Design a protein with these regions (language model features):
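Acidic/His- and Gly-rich active-site-bordering loop/insert found
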Residues: 9-137, 144
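Intrinsic structural disorder
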Residues: 1-2, 41
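Short, positively charged and aromatic/hydrophobic N-terminal segments
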Residues: 2-3, 9
């Protein structure tokens, strides 16, 4: 795998079979990371989950920092003094000759609504066939996991 701060040998393209093998090898760790994100009820629209939103941002910051990125949790303060929700910014040093890439994702989730309408715990990722279910698993936990 290629990690931030290291350039892969780009002198030749990866064959689709090599790429598939690498993705399959990485899948268990990616699934574990996604499972950890789904377990955090980071509902930003609900003040009762403010600590969970903070925990989500910090969890992701720690993961990026562990990969060698400079990662920070930032907040804006509104004119009325209200502190904003946490946003995470991470970057790696520029590699000469490599393009600049910007990746974006959000770490908060929508409320679950009526729990009686769920057939499972919304904050416990569940694999069914070739799909992963859980609040925020695709929007946007999968995006964050792929960034990691």
């Amino acid at each position: 795998m290629v990690y931030p701060g290291r350039m892969a040998d780009t002198s030749h393209a990866l064959s689709s079979s090599v790429l598939r093998e690498r993705l399959e090898a990485a899948f268990p760790s990616l699934l574990e990371e996604l499972t950890q994100l789904v377990a955090i009820p980071s509902v930003s629209s609900d003040p009762a989950h403010a600590a969970d939103v903070e925990r989500s941002a910090e969890h992701i910051r720690e993961r990026f920092a562990a990969l060698g990125l400079d990662a920070k949790v930032l907040r804006e303060t509104a004119a009325d003094g209200t502190e904003g929700k946490p946003a995470l910014v991470a970057h790696s040093p520029r590699i000469e000759g490599a393009p600049t890439v910007l990746l974006y994702a959000h770490h908060d989730v929508q409320p679950v609504g009526e729990l009686s309408r769920w057939s499972m715990d919304p904050y416990k990722a569940e694999v069914r066939g070739d799909r992963i279910y859980g609040r925020g698993s695709s929007d946007d936990g999968a995006g964050i996991t792929v960034h990691l």
